[in-house]
Amino acid sequence: MAHCAVVATEKGAGGDREHDILNGERSTQRETDAVTQRMEIEQRVWEVLDGLGVPYEVIAIDAAYADTAAFCERYGFPLDHSANTIIVSSKKEPRQYCACLGLATTRLDVNHTVRKLMGVSRASFASAEDTMALTGMMIGGVTVFALPRDLPIYIDEMIMSLDYVILGGGSRSLKIKLSPEVLQRLPNTNIVGSLSI
């Protein structure tokens, strides 16, 4: 449901009402656009997974608990079977990007392993805005599925020894549970040792 943004003004009642209605319409349109975008990216993720012909489980969640630690605590999943997809960017122009998948219990080694894999002098996590522009996904929902085909994907080898892994589903409202073996079937994917520390 849309909520009007009420702004205190010194106008008469009519002016205030008109201002509130306009704000409400803008808010409704923004929310509609956000829902449409979320549904489109979720559909793309499902199409990729279905195209791989592999079994997977979709976990619908409250978007407020999309961040991995909050998700695990809220829904009772183990943190050591959860992974985060993080977009990394070079700091210098022209910008280069890659996607890294690491366990939630570890930390990406951006300054050494990832930087060397990218062949750049300095690298850092991409901003939320750059991540959205590149992938169409919000932080907390980013997944290795449905990424641009030319984007390098680096997966921590520790993930491959798990019986299952849970990762983002494309939006903050979904998680995907599947066998790590599936990850090797994605294009432009490399399994990397010491990706995380």
Language model segments and positions:
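Extended, low-hydrophobicity, polar/charged segments
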Residues: 4, 18-197
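Short, strongly patterned local motifs
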Residues: 12-13
